[in-house]
C-alpha cells in the first residue's frame, strides 16, 4: 500500500509499504529516498511517536495514512515551553544550549524578545549564561514561560549573613510587595523585615520608584528584633500612618519620623495620646505608649489650612495653603511636590475648573477641601488600555490619532508588536485606519487589549450535533493542519473528517487563504463513516 510522510518543511514523501513492515523498515525507506539517517528520524502518527520494533499494523496505519517526520538533532532533544495562555511550544535543543539560545529559539517561533522572557523550571528562574544540562533539563521536560513586561527589573537583597537574594520587581511595587516576595523566598515574616537603601529605612506604603531604586540596585535586609514596636498615628483626615519606634524614642524623634513620611514640619505637629498633648522632651515610655497604640496628630497652622489634591491615579497630595492663595500658587506647590508643570495641570473643585487668576476663597475652598487634578495634554487627552492580565496602561493621545498610532504607543510602553494587538472598545474591534474620534473614544475611555498570536486568527468549526469548536489558525494553514487541530481537540481522526465552507468541501492540500476563509469564519464538520466515501 502507499503511505505518505510529511516533513516539517511541508514536503510530502510517498512510500510503498506493507502493514507488516516495522518502523525501522519505514525509516530505512525514508533514508533511501531522503538520505536522513534513521537515528535522526522521529515518526509521529495520530499524535503518537512510533517505536522502532512495532509494525504499521500495530498502529492501525492504513493505506494513504500520513505520518509526520520530525528530525531529532544529533545529541539533540525536544523540550516543551508552556506559556501563561496555556499554549505549548515545542523546541529542538541540545543539552549544551544555554538559556540565551533557548530564548532566541522562542523569539524565532513566537516573536517575544528575549529580554521580556523569564523561563522557569522546577520552580527556579533560569539564568541566561547557564545551559540546559546545568539545570538537568532532559528530553521532553517542560519549561514555563512568563513574560516580563517592560518596566520589570531585577534587584538584589543582601542579608546580614552575607547571602544575596534576587527578586523580580516593577518600579511601581510598594515596599510591602517586596517584603512579601522576600517572605516567599526566605520565609521571613514582613513584620520582622527592615529594608535599607542608600542609608534610609524603606516604608511600606512607598514604591521602589519613590526611592529611585533601579534595576540591579542592592537593598539591605535587617531583621527587626521584637523590642522595637509599631505605633499608629491618626490624622484629622482619618489617614493612619504606621511608625517603627522604640519605647525610648522621645517625642521629637517621633515627630521627625512623621516629617519623613508626610512632610509636615515638627513645629506644626501636635501629638495627643489618652487626651494629653505630648511634650517634645519626654519618651514614649514616659507616657506608657505601647506597641500598636494610636496617637492623634493635630496640625498647628499659621493662619493657613490644609487642602488635599487627588490625582487620577488615586494618589492624594496634602498642601499647606492660605485662602488668599491664587490658583497659580497652588499649581506651583503641586509642581514642587510632584514635578508636574503648571501648564499641564487642570484643577477641578465642585465640578468646576479653577482659573489661574482667582483665589481659593473665590471658590469657597476651605480647610480639608479636596481638589481633583487632571493632566492637560497639549490638545490631547488620556485614555486607558486594560490588558487581559488586569494591568492598566495610561496613554497620552489625540482624538485624531488613528488606531495604528495607538498600537505604536502601546508597543513603546509594553513591547508588544502592533500586529499582535487587538483593541476592543464598546464591544467592537478597532480597525487600524480609523481614528479614536471615529469610534467616539473620549478622554478617560478604557480600551481592552487582546493579544493576537502572530498572523493568527480564530475560526469556528460547527459539528452536526450543533457543538462549536474554536481553533487558533493561520491563513497559511492547510486543511490537513486544521483537521489535525480538530483531532487534538475532539479526537476525530482526520480521515473521518469532511470540512465544508460556503457549500464547498475543502481539500487537504489547499490552505485556508485559498478558500478565502478569514477570521471568525465558520466551517461545518461532517463525519465520513468508515467504509463510506
Curated annotation (Swiss-Prot):
Q: Name one GO biological process term.
A: protein ubiquitination
Q: Any coiled-coil ranges, and where?
A: none
Ubl conjugation listed as a keyword: yes
Q: Which keywords fit this entry according to its UniProt record?
A: Cytoplasm, Isopeptide bond, Nucleus, Repeat, Ubl conjugation
Which one Pfam family would you cite for this protein?
ubiquitin
Q: Which residues form the propeptide?
A: 533
User: Any keyword Ubl conjugation?
Assistant: yes
The covalently linked position for Glycyl lysine isopeptide (Lys-Gly) (interchain with G-Cter in ubiquitin), per the record, is 48
Superkingdom, taxonomy of origin: Eukaryota
Location in the cell: Cytoplasm; Nucleus
Please report the stretch or stretches of sequence annotated as the Ubiquitin-like domain. 1-76, 77-152, 153-228, 229-304, 305-380, 381-456, 457-532
Name the PROSITE patterns for this protein. Answer: UBIQUITIN_1, UBIQUITIN_2
Q: Name one GO molecular function term.
A: protein tag activity
PANTHER family assigned: UBIQUITIN
**Function, please?**
Ubiquitin exists either covalently attached to another protein, or free (unanchored). When covalently bound, it is conjugated to target proteins via an isopeptide bond either as a monomer (monoubiquitin), a polymer linked via different Lys residues of the ubiquitin (polyubiquitin chains) or a linear polymer linked via the initiator Met of the ubiquitin (linear polyubiquitin chains). Polyubiquitin chains, when attached to a target protein, have different functions depending on the Lys residue of the ubiquitin that is linked: Lys-48-linked is involved in protein degradation via the proteasome.
Q: What else is known?
A: Ubiquitin is synthesized as a polyubiquitin precursor with exact head to tail repeats. Some ubiquitin genes contain a single copy of ubiquitin fused to a ribosomal protein. In D.discoideum there are 9 genes: ubqA: 5 copies of Ub and a final Asn; ubqB: 1 copy of Ub and ribosomal protein eL40; ubqC: 1 copy of Ub and ribosomal protein eS31; ubqD: 3 copies of Ub and a final Leu; ubqF: 7 copies of Ub and a final Asn; ubqG: 5 copies of Ub and a final Leu; ubqH: 5 copies of Ub and a final Asn; ubqI: 4 copies of Ub and a final Asn; ubqJ: 4 copies of Ub and a final Asn. For the sake of clarity sequence features are annotated only for the first chain, and are not repeated for each of the following chains.
Q: Which family does this protein fall into?
A: Belongs to the ubiquitin family.
User: What is this protein's name?
Assistant: Polyubiquitin-F
The species is Dictyostelium discoideum (Social amoeba)
Q: Which gene encodes it?
A: ubqF
Amino acid at each position: 500500500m502507499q503511505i505518505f510522510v510529511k516533513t516539517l518543511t511541508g514536503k510530502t514523501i510517498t512510500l510503498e509499504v506493507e502493514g507488516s513492515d516495522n518502523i525501522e523498515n519505514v525509516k530505512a525507506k525514508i533514508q533511501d529516498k531522503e538520505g536522513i539517517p534513521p537515528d535522526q528520524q522521529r515518526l509521529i502518527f495520530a499524535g503518537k511517536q512510533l517505536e522502532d520494533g512495532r509494525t504499521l499494523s500495530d498502529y492501525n496505519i492504513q493505506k494513504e495514512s500520513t505520518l509526520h517526520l520530525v528530525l531529532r538533532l544529533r545529541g539533540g532533544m525536544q523540550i516543551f515551553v508552556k506559556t501563561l495562555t496555556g499554549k505549548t511550544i515545542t523546541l529542538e535543543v541540545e543539552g549544551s544550549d544555554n538559556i540565551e539560545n533557548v530564548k532566541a529559539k522562542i523569539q524565532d517561533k513566537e516573536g517575544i524578545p528575549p529580554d521580556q522572557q523569564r523561563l522557569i523550571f522546577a520552580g527556579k528562574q533560569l539564568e541566561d549564561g547557564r545551559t540546559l544540562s546545568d539545570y538537568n533539563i532532559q528530553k521532553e521536560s517542560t519549561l514555563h514561560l512568563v513574560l516580563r513586561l517592560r518596566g520589570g527589573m531585577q534587584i538584589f537583597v543582601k542579608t546580614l549573613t552575607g547571602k544575596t537574594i534576587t527578586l523580580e520587581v516593577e518600579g511601581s511595587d510598594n515596599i510591602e510587595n517586596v517584603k512579601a516576595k522576600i517572605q516567599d523566598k526566605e520565609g521571613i515574616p514582613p513584620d520582622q523585615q527592615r529594608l535599607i537603601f542608600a542609608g534610609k529605612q524603606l516604608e511600606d506604603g512607598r514604591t521602589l520608584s519613590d526611592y529611585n531604586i533601579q534595576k540591579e540596585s542592592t537593598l539591605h535586609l535587617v531583621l527587626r528584633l521584637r523590642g522595637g514596636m509599631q505605633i499608629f498615628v491618626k490624622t484629622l483626615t482619618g489617614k493612619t500612618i504606621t511608625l517603627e519606634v522604640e519605647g525610648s524614642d522621645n517625642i521629637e524623634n517621633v515627630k521627625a519620623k512623621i516629617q519623613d513620611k508626610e512632610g509636615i514640619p515638627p513645629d506644626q505637629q501636635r501629638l495627643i495620646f489618652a487626651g494629653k498633648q505630648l511634650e517634645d522632651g519626654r519618651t514614649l515610655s514616659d507616657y506608657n505608649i505601647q506597641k500598636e497604640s494610636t496617637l492623634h496628630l493635630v496640625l498647628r497652622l499659621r493662619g493657613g489650612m490644609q487642602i488635599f489634591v487627588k490625582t487620577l491615579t488615586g494618589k492624594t497630595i496634602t498642601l499647606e495653603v492660605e485662602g488668599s492663595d491664587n490658583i497659580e500658587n497652588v499649581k506651583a506647590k503641586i509642581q514642587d511636590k510632584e514635578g508636574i508643570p503648571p501648564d499641564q495641570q487642570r484643577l477641578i473643585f465642585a465640578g468646576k475648573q479653577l482659573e489661574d487668576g482667582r483665589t481659593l476663597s473665590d471658590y469657597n475652598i476651605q480647610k480639608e477641601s479636596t481638589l481633583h487634578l487632571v493632566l492637560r495634554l497639549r490638545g490631547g487627552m488620556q485614555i486607558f488600555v486594560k490588558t487581559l492580565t488586569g494591568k492598566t496602561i495610561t496613554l497620552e493621545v489625540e482624538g485624531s490619532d488613528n488606531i495604528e498610532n495607538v498600537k505604536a504607543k502601546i508597543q513603546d510602553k509594553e513591547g508588544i508588536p502592533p500586529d499582535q494587538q487587538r483593541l476592543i472598545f464598546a464591544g467592537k474591534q478597532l480597525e487600524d485606519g480609523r481614528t479614536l474620534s471615529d469610534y467616539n473614544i473620549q478622554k478617560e475611555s478604557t480600551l481592552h487589549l487582546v493579544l493576537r498570536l502572530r498572523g493568527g486568527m480564530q475560526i469556528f468549526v460547527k459539528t452536526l450535533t450543533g457543538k462549536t469548536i474554536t481553533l487558533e489558525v493561520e491563513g497559511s494553514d492547510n486543511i490537513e493542519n486544521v483537521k489535525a487541530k480538530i483531532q487534538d481537540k475532539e479526537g476525530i481522526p482526520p480521515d473521518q473528517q469532511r470540512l465544508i465552507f460556503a457549500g464547498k468541501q475543502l481539500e487537504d492540500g489547499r490552505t485556508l487563504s485559498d478558500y478565502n476563509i478569514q477570521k471568525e469564519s465558520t466551517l461545518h464538520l461532517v463525519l465520513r463513516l468508515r467504509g463510506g466515501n
